[in-house]
């Protein structure tokens, strides 16, 4: 008798995705982040669901309802901090996952890569709207500043911003719609992630060497299921440490002050995972130019496949490109630091130089390095 997991219509899908999936035998720990992102997403949906049961999306009670969750709901503080810090862990995994894709040439699977970029934008939008919900000072002013950027769009900008706000400022209507979107988007992300996997399984996984691995495939289970479980346990340990020892480490103290439209915080800044993009935005004195640079800083990922000049797929055997890649990582860390600093000398010029370097590495230096490496190998 044939095994039910290979014949049942539903079980067959699961079997072909997580059990009998032929997987390259040499994929490293950098390939763990895909499954970790799945774990993070499920965790965020579950904790978010329980938070939504006690949260009220109203300007007068939102801040109090979050306080109520932390003080009065059984283990409410755990749920709240797992959700808040879970977002940070989510973004760490995201950056690692995208970095892996850049390093090993995974962007040469165009459908998977493009769905990934859409996922990245959707997750960033979801995280931004989630940050507004506690209705603290940084929630309110962050929402005001970031939504206001849309007013830089010629002709329709102002109308567009007021349409998004649902009034003439960030107010009750804005909070209500942000809650609605923040609730629905994770389920859209879940569907997109399924499509992302669907396209990945059309081609099979890439591997560190960048050469076809059809001759050496192993079943996903038990080899990679156990590896993914280990990754998930390490993720859980990291998150638990963060939640139980320093839950506010990555947050902003200003968000413990209820939102006040009459008092602007001294330094308005988003969550740490947006600081690199915020630094790029601030490094351009012109409003529209800054907004375009901000969007392009992420959208640039979409043209990476077109800029691939090397005859090798990954960077495993390309020392020049490796140096540029790690320079890019250092540059992004610098931008993250600058994004959290006030707009004054010397931070302005450092931010501008780091922004120029970011685009130069991706658009100019990496393609040139690929050509040089081809010539060095006489290819």
Swiss-Prot record:
The record gives the membrane topology as:
Multi-pass membrane protein
Consequence of changing residue 375 to S = In lineages GB10 and GB12
The Swiss-Prot or TrEMBL record lists the needed cofactor(s) as: heme b
GO MF term (any one): metal ion binding
From its record, what is one biological process in GO terms? mitochondrial electron transport, ubiquinol to cytochrome c
Q: Which domain of life does the UniProt lineage start with? A: Eukaryota
Quick one: which residues bind heme b b566? 97, 196
What does the Swiss-Prot or TrEMBL cofactor note state?
A: Binds 2 heme b groups non-covalently.
Could you tell me where this protein is found in the cell? Answer: Mitochondrion inner membrane
Further information: Heme 1 (or BL or b562) is low-potential and absorbs at about 562 nm, and heme 2 (or BH or b566) is high-potential and absorbs at about 566 nm.
Can you state the subunit structure given in the record? Answer: The cytochrome bc1 complex contains 11 subunits: 3 respiratory subunits (MT-CYB, CYC1 and UQCRFS1), 2 core proteins (UQCRC1 and UQCRC2) and 6 low-molecular weight proteins (UQCRH/QCR6, UQCRB/QCR7, UQCRQ/QCR8, UQCR10/QCR9, UQCR11/QCR10 and a cleavage product of UQCRFS1). This cytochrome bc1 complex then forms a dimer.
Matches recorded under PANTHER family = CYTOCHROME B (PTHR19271:SF16)
Q: What is this protein called?
A: Cytochrome b
UniProt source species: Ursus arctos (Brown bear)
Gene that this polypeptide is encoded by: MT-CYB
């Amino acid at each position: 008798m044939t095994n039910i997991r290979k014949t049942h219509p539903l079980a067959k899908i699961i079997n072909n995705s997580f059990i009998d999936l032929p997987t390259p035998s040499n994929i490293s720990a950098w390939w763990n982040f895909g499954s970790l992102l799945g774990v993070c997403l499920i965790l965020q949906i579950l904790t978010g669901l329980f938070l939504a049961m006690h949260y009220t999306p109203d300007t007068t009670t939102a801040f109090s309802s979050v306080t109520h969750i932390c003080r009065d709901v059984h283990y409410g503080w755990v749920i709240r901090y797992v959700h808040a810090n879970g977002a940070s862990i989510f973004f760490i995994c995201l950056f690692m996952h995208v970095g892996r894709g850049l390093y090993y040439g995974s962007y040469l699977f165009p459908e998977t890569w493009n769905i990934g970029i859409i996922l990245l934008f959707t997750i960033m939008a979801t995280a931004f709207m989630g940050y507004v919900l506690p209705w603290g000072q940084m929630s309110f002013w962050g929402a005001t500043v970031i939504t206001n950027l849309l007013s830089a769009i010629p002709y329709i900008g102002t109308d567009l911003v007021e349409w998004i706000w649902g009034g003439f400022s960030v107010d009750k209507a804005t909070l209500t719609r942000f809650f609605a979107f923040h609730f629905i988007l994770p389920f859209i992300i879940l569907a997109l992630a399924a499509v992302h996997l669907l396209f990945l399984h059309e081609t099979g996984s890439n591997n560190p060497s960048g050469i076809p691995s059809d001759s050496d495939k192993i079943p996903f289970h038990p080899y990679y299921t156990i590896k993914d479980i280990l990754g998930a346990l390490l993720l859980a340990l990291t998150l638990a440490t963060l939640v139980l020892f320093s839950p506010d480490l990555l947050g902003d103290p200003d968000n413990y002050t209820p939102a006040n439209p009459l008092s602007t915080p001294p330094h308005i800044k988003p969550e740490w995972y947006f600081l690199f993009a915020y630094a790029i935005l601030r490094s351009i004195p012109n409003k529209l130019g800054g907004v375009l640079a901000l969007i392009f800083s992420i959208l640039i990922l979409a043209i990476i496949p077109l800029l691939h000049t090397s005859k090798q797929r990954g960077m495993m055997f390309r020392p020049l490109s490796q140096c540029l890649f790690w320079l890019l990582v250092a540059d992004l860390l610098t931008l993250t630091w600058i994004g959290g600093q006030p707009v004054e000398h010397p931070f302005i010029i450092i931010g501008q130089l780091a922004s120029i370097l970011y685009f130069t590495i991706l658009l100019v230096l990496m393609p040139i390095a690929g050509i040089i490496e081809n010539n060095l190998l006489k290819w």
